[in-house]
Amino acid sequence: MSLAAVLRIADAMADRAGILSRELDAAALIARARRHDGPDAFGDIPIAEPLARLLDACAAEAGPSLVGRAALRWDVLRFLGNLRRLAAEEAADPTIRDEPIAAPIFVTGLPRSGTSFLHRLLLEAPDNHAPRVWQTIAPYPPEGGRADRRIAQVDRQLAAFVRLAPEFPGLHPLRAASPQECSEILAHVFRSLRFDSTWRVPSYRAWLDRAGQLPAYLFERRFLQHLQHQRRRPGAEPGAGRWVLKCPDHVFALRDLRAAFPDARIVFVHRDPVSVVLSVAKLTAVLRRPFSRAVDPIEIGRGESARWQLGARLMMQATTDGPAGDGAGDGAGDGAGGRICHLHHAELVADPLGAVRQVYRHFGLRLDPIAEAAVAGAASRQPNGGYAHDAYRFADYGLDPAREREAFRDYVEYFDILPELGPPRAVRRTLSRAA
C-alpha cells in the first residue's frame, strides 16, 4: 500500500473520531510554550493576533489533514520555542540588539524567475552571507551542553517531507545548508506568505495585506542580529560581512521592508510571467497536498495568477515611486545607481558573472578577483542556471496563455521583457533549479 493511501485511511479514521474538526487554539499553544518562562517568554514580540488569524483560517479554509494538523502544531511550537530562546539570549546579552545590519541586499521579483540562482551566485563572494535553512529552523544550538546536531537533524526533516511530497526536490531543491528565503524568518511572528503557500488561507492573507508586514521585518532585522552576533563569538566564522537575502514575497511589502531596513538595496529579477505562473501554481499544489485533504489545482492556478498580477503592478509602482513610496524611484537613493537594480532572467542565464557585476556596479560595490572567480566557477557548474526541463499544461491549472499574456501586458511592456517561446497550450519548464 502506498504512503498516500495510508494517509487517506488515517484521515478517514481521524475524521470519524472528530479529530480533524477540533479547534486549533492559539492561546493554548502560546500557554504551552510559556509554561517554563512565564508571560515574558517572548519579550516584546506581538504574536497573539497573527497566530490566531492563521490558525482560524487553517481550521476554516485549509481542510488540514491529520499530517497537516500535526505539522502545523509542530511548526507553531517550534517558532514559539525559537522566540523564547531569542528573548532569553537577549536578556543574557543585551549587546545582541546593538549589532549593525548595514545595507543588506534583498533579491526579489516574480517567483521562478531566477531569484534563487542569483542569490546563490551572490553568496559565492566571501563577504556575502545568508541565513541557511538549518539556522532558520534552529537559530541556536541546544541548551544544556547537548551535542549540536542541527544540520543533520534538519536534513532528516527535509527527507521526511520529500517522502510526503516526492515532486518537491525537482521544483525547489533544498538541503539544510542551502540559503533560506526570508519568508521562513518572517513566519516566526506568524506574518508570512509562507503560510499562504502551504495552506489555503485566503482570510489570513487578506488580513496580512491589511495589517502590513512591518512587525515581521523588524523581527527579521532582530533575527539577523542574533545570527550575526554568533558569528563574532570565538571559534565562529569571522566577520559580519554583508547580508544578501531573498524572497519573491518582498514585492508585496516593500514599504514595510524599507521602513525596517532604510538602507536596503533591492534587486528585481524580471522574467516573462507566462513562463513562470504555471510553475508557481505547480509548486503551490505540491506544497499543499501533504497537509490538506483536498487541493484544487484550478483554484490555485487562478489565484496565483491574480496574486502575481498584483505583485507585478507593485514592482512597477516601486520603480516609479521608490520602494518606500517616497517618490525616490530608480534615479535616486543609495549607491551609484539608485535604490533598485533591475535584472532580466535572460541576461542572468546568458552571462551570470556579468549579472553579478551589474548588481555590484549598480550599488557602487567592488567585486574583487577572488569573488569573481568564485562566481564564475559556480555558474560553470550550473549551465543555463541549472535549469531542468519539464512541461506543464495551462488547462490543468485553469489558465489560458493568451489571457495570461494580456493580464501581464503592462508589466511586460514596462520592463521590456521578451516573451519566451513555447508550445501554445503548455509551457516548457526550464527554471526549477534556478528558481
Task: Describe every region a protein language model picked out.
Residues 88-98:
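Pre-Walker A adenine-sensing motif
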Residues 106-126:
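Glycine-rich phosphate-binding P-loop
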Residues 124-134:
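Post-Walker A helix-loop "phosphate-sensing" segment adjacent to the P-loop in P-loop NTPases
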Residues 136-243:
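PAPS-dependent sulfation machinery
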Residues 241-263:
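Flexible, glycine/threonine-enriched loop-and-boundary segments that flank and lead into catalytic domains
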Residues 243-246, 268-270, 342-345:
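Short beta-strand segments
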Residues 256-282:
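Conserved phosphate-donor/acceptor-positioning beta-strand/loop module used by diverse small-molecule
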